Amino acid sequence: AQHGRAAAVAAAIKRCRPDRTVLTYQGDGDALAIGFSETMYAAIRNENITVIFVNNTNFGMTGGQMAPTTLPGQKTTTSPYGRDCAVTGNPLKAIDMLKTLDIAYAARGAVTTAAEIAKTKRYIRNAFEAQLNGEGYSFVEVLSPCPTNWGMPPLAAKERVASTIQEYYPVGEFVKRREKRHD
């Protein structure tokens, strides 16, 4: 799918092939910047797809620019003095928005420790189970380090996720509706 259009393409595939398991794997820009409308409207329609969203708080594949998820004060190539929320607005908390909708499942995990990775794997499994059971839209946000664009060694980046990013974006299951949707 074109950048930002993954949820729309996934919804179309699922409607054409409802017997298939359909997922998107998206980053900050794809899911919450250029693809924000597609991500949210797939959720609003409760499309029976699974979205895996990797949040590393920057546009990691294009040079580390500020993303919708960039934390207050975080320096990026386009916010060299740190994100100023008075100018750019606050970071987008996608799950907080999704919790207001009639979706099947929403969770946020991290890849910082073996225990957190195991929980995140369980969240992803739960998201796919929701789709396989015909319950509707499922969304898993995965907090991930970005050592290259954060300008730090991998272990320090992992610690930053655990100490700073998880404080702003807490992990856990936030929506867990276990009933088949009504079409």
PLM regions and their residue ranges:
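Thiamine diphosphate
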Residues: A1-G60, R122-N126
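Flexible, low-complexity linker and terminal segments
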Residues: L132-D183
